[in-house]
Every structure is written in C-alpha cells, then in structure tokens.
C-alpha cells in the first residue's frame, strides 16, 4: 500500500460518518424548523418582530451553519477517540484493502464514471454528492503539487529568489496555467490534443531540454547577482520598466515546461491525494454529465488557487529559513558585512542551478537510446523487427532462460560447468518480469532448505570428463581431414594411442554426446500413484528397488521448518503476509466455516459428476480397472483435486503440517482435510503427504480407494428407445407459477400395471451408452407404465425422478437401489455370473394399497419441488418402506 493510500485510509477513520451526520443536520431544514418554532413565541408586537429579525435570527442562522459544517468534524474526532480506546482502530485499519477491490471491480465493469459514491469512501472534508466539495479537495491536493521538486518549480524558485516576488509570481503563473490546462484536457477528454501531443515523444522531451539549456545560458551570460541586488531594494514596476517582452518570454517558457517535463525529485509526493481516488487525476463518480463538469471544474479551480497560495508560502518560508540560517550559523553578531551576505546569496543561487542541471541530466536515463532513435520511426520498445539490428539481451533458447531464472540456476550450472554465466535479466524488463511465478517465491525457511540442496549438490559434483579430440572438421574431399586437438594429457604415448583409435574407428566423425557417468538419476523424486496394481505397471523391479530415498532427507527438512516456525517474529511476519494476501480478495469471496463445508460438498458432488463422465479408454487394462475401481485411481488424479493443483505443496513448504489423530482438533487444510477425516483409517488416500519411505506399507495389501458415487442420478423411461434409462444428466421442468406446480398431475402407480415376480437375467439387455454415464438397463415395454404421465401436457423425457442414494444394507428399500456398474458386459457371461454388478430394479410381490400410492405421490411431488428451487444443493431422497408405515 502506498503512502497516499495510507494517509487517505487514516483520515477515513476519523471522517467516515460525515455523510450520515449531514443527513441529520440539513441546513435548509434546520433553518426553517428553528425559525418556525421560535417565531410564534416571540411575535406579538412590532417591537418584538424588529428584535427577532435584527438580533435573534442572524445568530441562530450562524449557529445552524456552524453546526452544519463543523459539528460532523468534532463528532468524527469523538468516534475516533472511542474506537481508539475500544481497540477497534487496528481492526478497521486492517480492513481497508477490502474496499479497493470494489473499485477494481467497478472499473472492469465500466460503470465507475457515473455511479453514486460509496458509503465507505468518505474522505477528508468531502461532502456528499448533492454538495460535492471538490474545490477543497483540489485546494488540499495543491499542498503536494506546489512543492518545488520539478525543474519548472526550481526555476520558479530561482526567479523568486534572485529577481524578486514579481518575476517569481509570473513564473509561477506560467507553470500553474500550463499545469491546469493539461489537467483540463485530461479530465474533460480532449483526445485530439493529448494523443497528438504525447505521440511526439521524444521530441517534446528534447524541447524541454532545449528550454532548460537556453535558460541556463541566459542566466550565465547575464549580469552577476551583485549587480541585480543593487536594484532589489526598489520595488519592481512592470509598466515603468517596460519589460513586457521579458514577462511574456518567462510566462511562455514555464507554460511549455509544464507540458514537456517528465521528471522531478520525489515524484511520489505529487501523487498524494486527499480524495478517495488513487491519484490526483483519477476521475470521480458523478450522477450526471452536468454534475461531472461542475465537480471537475471546481476541482481544477481549487488546484489553481491552492498552488498560487502554497507556492508563495513555500518560497517565502524557504527564503526566510535560508536568511535565518545565514544569520545564526554563518555570521556572528559582531561580524555582519554586506559582502558575506552577497556571497551567501550567490552560493544559494549557484546550488539551485546545479540542482536544476542535475535533475535534467538524471532524466536522460529514463529513455533508452534505442527507443529515442527508433520511436520516431514507429517502432515500439523492444520491437522484434529490430532484434537483428540492435543488441538483444533476450535468450533464444527457452531452456537457458528457464535455467538462468532465479531459483533455477543451480540445475543448469550443475549440468554444464563450461557455460559462462551472465545475469542479464536484471537489465531486461521484459525477461525479468516473466521469470518468477507466484508458486516459485521462496520465503526464508524455504530458502534455507533450497540453499542446503545447493550446498549438497556442490559437494557431490564431479569433474566433467573431456575427450582428447574436441572438434572435428570434414571437408568435401573425404580422403583429407583436418583435426584440431586439445590435449588434456601430457604424454605422447596417450596422444598416439588416441590418434590411432580415431583412424581405425569408422564412426569417429559422427558427432556424439558424451554421457556423464556420474549423472545421478532422480527417479526417486517421482512419487508413484499408489492406486495402480503392480501387475499393471511397466517398470523394472530391480531398478526400482535400487533407487530409494535417503532416510534423513525428510527429517532434516522438518527440523529446518520447525527451527524457523518456532521463531515468534518469523511466524508473525509469515502469518501477517499470508493473511494480508487472503484479505485482499473480494468480500463476497470470504466464506464462513459452514459455507466452506457446503462448498466442499458441492465440489465433491461436481467432481463425482465429471468423474462419472470421464472414461479412461486409452489406459491399459481399462476394463479391469473400471470393474474394480469405478472411479479415478487417486484423489490426486481426479477432477476435484486438479483445481487445487499445487496448493498442498505450497502450504507444506511454508508451514509444518502433520496428520493429527485427535478428532477434536479443527481442520488444518481446507478442502483436503475432510477427505482424510472420511478415510481416517486409510491414510494413503493422501499419499502425497506421506514421507518418501517405501517400506512403510506393502503394495500387495493396499486395495486402493473406495469407489465413489456420482450424485445426483436420475431414472426415466426413454420413449424413443423404449428402454428404462438411468442417467446423471438432469433435465429440469420449469414451473412459472406455484399454481402450475400444484396442478402437476402426478400419476398414481396402478397396482394392476405392476409386474409381479422377480426379473430374470434373460430380460436384460447389453449395456449401451446412450449419453455419457447413461445406461440402458431394460427393454421390457411393461416397465414404461411405471413412469407413465399424460403426454399431452408434458414432452417426452420430462418425467425424470431422483434416484436413491447408495444404500446396499437396506434391502427393504421399496423402489430402487444402486450397485456398481460393469462396462460392456457380455450377455452370455451374465447368465452364469453370481456377482451383482448392475443397477437393479426391485419388484415387490405384495399388492400395494391406495394409502401407499398416495404417500408415494407425496414423496415424488416433494422431489420435484426441491429440484425446481434455484440452488445447487445435492438432493438425496430415500423412499423407505418403514417410513411409509
């Protein structure tokens, strides 16, 4: 947060209730009501009327105005003191970053220009919309604009100091009118002027340099300060001296400098703003065009008046301080000569000119030489068309760019010691901004751990073996060859042996990459998915057993993290930084614990839905895997976990995380820890947080994850296919009115149309994929009557009912129950199979009565009502025979 925002937020603590207080102290209402209440008491004679009009009403009106304008300020200070003693000040101050997200959102929505003010954006001395006091905001902003930090203002101060107040005021007016005209064009949208003027860069910049150099030349060639000081006692009479031409040149010079200069000392001070905007040129909100013109015009006028006032005050204060410094510290009471005073004045003027020259020279570094030469030709900075002409610091090899990035340099240097490392990214803005991502930023504890890896790799690094013959050339004439030998061995015997070996080798001229025998394989860093069966994994067991992790690697890492995390200062700073990052999100994104739990359930339901639609058809042993797992192999690979890819890794780097078996402890990881709570006995559902020790469990005894369900599921009768279909694709029926829902003709299931007796496997049909994860189970036309409705009112496939949740233990469930699904079953094998691996339909042998049919209709109607509610909860419904009884 910048100093401007910090100052603005601090003032908002005291004045946040000004608008509300203005609503209770309206000037017109107070004046009328007060007068109407007092007049009946005092009137009754002419003398009393005269006394009331002359002596009573003016003080009352003045008192009302005093209360209207100044009471909110005193009331704000009172609330500020109360908040200070109630320890709420720090809490209010910490919530300020949440406010700026609303402004960013309105900017993206493009509705910030003519939108009413925010209730929590009241600034210092700023009135409501109906009395927008932008004049005072501009007047206060001129406090920082008038500081003599730019070259133009330094020249104005020099004229004020050397030539007197008259020339100083003329120079200040030239600078101020030029500045206000620039603000006027920017705030009122004079695009032809602004775009055409700034498109001349860098010509306008060179124009500013020329004006400043011309001023320095005239100043040096002019008379000395002593000669000017002779006439300093006499007041300057502009008409008598007839220096109109000089006045016009001074005014025009400072006017042009206001449009051309771009550099100043302490440029951050000029961006300070007492208003609610981020800077002094931000457009404020207004309800109409006329109100916008009025507020912005008063704002510019306030800047104009304030700059004249504060510029004069600053110049007078600086000059008086210089004289007081000369009087106290330079000359004594007994030794005050005119020559010493003249020398002091000359020294101040000389130092001011040196400061002007220094600021001007320092501004040249803001423009690249290539940009200054090519921008007038239409080229942009770092244009690719000029990459072959100008010196380009961008690396063409992406691997080199990645290896040279901060945090990645050790891997590149370790693999190639012959590479000359040159860090050019700190001089190239384009490359420097794209080198680091958010996940790669290392905090102190992570830096210590990564630096330990660097030191460990440095100790284990071996010298890179080299060949005797490093380069070879082959000419067009194959009978003649040229060699350039770099001999690393001093003996002639070894040289002759290597030369003979090259002549005898037929493939000696083939360029080959010499492999480093000491290269370490980092296979152990790859964590295998523990849900794979061993028979399905194509790896070499001998090689896999030989590459195990180091035993002390995980323990040392935990010790380093614990060492830094128990440090109170580091812990507070880390928590403050993480909390501040989280607090900068939108206010509607901050959820409570019940909302987070509900969001987690929705995400699980959505992930199960997508997982049910996703087929791993390209995997080996797909049928066996689908039959055993019926879902993703691991929580790492499923859709739900992929949207949080990297979250657990980043958190585990910053904080010491461990699995705690205490059920009373609150969750330490959002989204992930509830999965561990659900499968507490089986920790390997989160195998990524288990230390790299392969002996902790056996692959043979690990049966993988439990199969998850895809909910909600629906069942209906497909009229086109004449089949019973179970699907997870929801088709909702929209009801416009409540009466339409009440008149929904839920058809009672007729007992005569119910098929008696169990179904046989011969009535089943081969499983077909109608839609994704929609299965056709029965082709018996008699089942259609169970889902029959009036086709004149509703279209086909509208009668979709919610399938019951997975409940294998309740065998008295009346309508449906769900089991695992086997993809593409063979009909011949199903007849001889004893495994229940189907969506099954249960039939009751008993005859149903009318009371049960009415209860069933009530439950079905309740389902449809819940579905048509416009929310996304995971509805589950159980239709139990016991509950009906």
UniProtKB/Swiss-Prot annotation:
It is a multi-pass membrane protein. It is found in: Plastid, Chloroplast membrane. The chain crosses the membrane at residues 62-82, 135-155, 168-188, 193-213, 299-319, 344-364. Keywords: Chloroplast, Membrane, Plastid, Transmembrane, Transmembrane helix. One of its GO terms (cellular component) is chloroplast membrane. The keyword Zinc-finger does not apply. Belongs to the ycf78 family. This is Uncharacterized membrane protein ycf78. The lineage of its organism: Eukaryota, Sar, Rhizaria, Cercozoa, Chlorarachniophyceae.
């Amino acid at each position: 947060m910048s100093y401007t925002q910090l100052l603005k937020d601090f003032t908002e603590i005291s004045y946040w209730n000004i608008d509300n207080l203005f609503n209770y102290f309206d000037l017109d209402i107070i004046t009328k009501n007060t007068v109407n209440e007092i007049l009946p008491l005092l009137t009754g004679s002419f003398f009393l009327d005269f006394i009331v009009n002359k002596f009573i009403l003016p003080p009352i009106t003045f008192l009302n105005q005093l209360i209207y304008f100044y009471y909110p300020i005193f009331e704000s200070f009172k609330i500020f003191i109360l908040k200070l003693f109630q320890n709420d000040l720090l809490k209010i101050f910490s919530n300020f970053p949440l406010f700026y997200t609303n402004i960013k959102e309105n900017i993206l929505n493009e509705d910030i220009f003519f939108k009413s003010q925010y209730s929590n954006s009241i600034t210092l001395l700023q009135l409501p919309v109906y009395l927008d006091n932008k004049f005072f905001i501009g007047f206060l902003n001129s406090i920082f604009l008038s500081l003599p930090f730019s070259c133009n203002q330094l020249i104005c101060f020099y004229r004020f100091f050397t030539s007197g107040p008259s020339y100083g005021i003329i120079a200040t007016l030239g600078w101020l009118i030029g500045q206000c005209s620039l603000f006027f064009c920017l705030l009122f949208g004079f695009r032809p002027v602004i775009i055409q003027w700034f498109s001349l860069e860098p010509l306008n910049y060179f124009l500013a340099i020329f004006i400043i150099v011309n001023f320095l030349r005239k100043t040096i060639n002019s008379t000395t300060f002593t000669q000017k000081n002779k006439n300093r006692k006499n007041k300057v009479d502009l008409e008598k001296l007839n220096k109109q031409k000089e006045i016009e040149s001074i005014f025009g010079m400072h006017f042009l400098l206001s449009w051309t200069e771009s550099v100043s000392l302490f440029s951050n001070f000029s961006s300070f703003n007492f208003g609610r905007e981020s800077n002094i040129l931000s457009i404020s909100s207004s309800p109409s065009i006329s109100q916008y013109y009025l507020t912005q015009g008063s704002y510019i006028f306030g800047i104009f008046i304030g700059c004249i006032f504060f510029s004069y005050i600053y110049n007078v204060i600086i000059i008086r301080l210089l004289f007081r410094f000369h009087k106290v510290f330079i000359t004594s009471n007994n030794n005050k000569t005119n020559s010493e005073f003249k020398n002091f004045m000359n020294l101040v003027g000389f130092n001011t000119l040196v400061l002007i020259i220094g600021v001007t020279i320092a501004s040249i570094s803001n423009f690249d030489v290539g940009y200054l030469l090519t921008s007038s030709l239409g080229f942009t900075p770092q244009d690719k068309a000029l990459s072959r002409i100008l010196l380009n610091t961008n690396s063409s090899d992406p691997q080199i760019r990645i290896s040279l990035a901060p945090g990645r340099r050790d891997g590149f240097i370790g693999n190639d010691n012959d590479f000359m490392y040159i860090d050019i990214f700190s001089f190239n803005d384009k490359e420097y901004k794209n080198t680091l991502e958010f996940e790669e930023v290392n905090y102190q504890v992570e830096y210590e751990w990564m630096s330990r890896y660097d030191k460990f790799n440095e100790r284990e690094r071996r010298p890179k073996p080299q060949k005797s013959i490093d380069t070879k050339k082959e000419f067009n004439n194959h009978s003649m060859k040229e060699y350039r030998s770099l001999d690393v061995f001093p003996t002639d015997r070894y040289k002759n042996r290597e030369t003979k070996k090259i002549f005898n080798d037929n493939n000696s001229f083939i360029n080959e990459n010499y492999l480093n025998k000491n290269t370490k394989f980092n296979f152990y860093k790859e964590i295998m998915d523990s849900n794979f069966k061993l028979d399905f994994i194509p790896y070499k067991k001998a090689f896999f057993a030989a590459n195990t992790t180091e035993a002390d690697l995980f323990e040392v890492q935990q010790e380093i993290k614990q060492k830094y995390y128990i440090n109170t200062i580091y812990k507070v700073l880390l928590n403050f930084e993480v909390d501040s990052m989280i607090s900068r999100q939108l206010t509607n994104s901050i959820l409570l614990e019940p909302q987070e739990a509900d969001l987690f359930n929705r995400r699980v339901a959505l992930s199960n839905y997508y997982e049910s639609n996703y087929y791993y058809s390209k995997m080996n042993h797909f049928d066996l895997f689908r039959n055993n797992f019926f879902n993703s192999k691991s929580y790492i690979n499923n859709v739900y976990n992929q949207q949080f890819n990297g979250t657990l890794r980043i958190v585990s780097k910053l904080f010491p995380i461990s699995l705690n078996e205490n059920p009373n402890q609150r969750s330490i990881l959002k989204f992930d820890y509830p999965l561990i709570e659900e499968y507490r006995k089986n920790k390997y559902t989160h195998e990524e947080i288990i230390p790299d020790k392969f002996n902790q469990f056996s692959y043979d005894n690990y049966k993988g994850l439990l199969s998850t369900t895809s909910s909600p599921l629906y069942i209906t009768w497909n009229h086109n296919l004449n089949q019973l279909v179970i699907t997870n694709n929801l088709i909702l029926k929209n009801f416009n009115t409540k009466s339409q829902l009440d008149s929904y003709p839920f058809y009672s299931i007729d007992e005569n149309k119910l098929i008696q007796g169990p179904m046989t496997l011969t009535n089943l049909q081969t499983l077909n994929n109608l839609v994704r994860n929609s299965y056709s189970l029965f082709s018996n036309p008699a089942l259609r009557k169970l889902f029959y409705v009036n086709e004149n009112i509703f279209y086909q496939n509208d009668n979709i009912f919610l399938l019951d949740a997975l409940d294998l233990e309740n065998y008295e469930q009346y309508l449906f129950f769900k089991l695992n699904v086997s993809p593409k079953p063979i009909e011949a094998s199903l007849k001889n199979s004893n495994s229940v691996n189907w969506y099954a339909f249960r039939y009751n042998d008993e005859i149903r009565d009318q009371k049960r049919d009415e209860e069933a209709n009530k439950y079905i109607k309740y389902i449809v009502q819940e579905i048509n509610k416009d929310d996304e909860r995971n509805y589950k419904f159980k239709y139990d025979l016991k509950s009906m009884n």
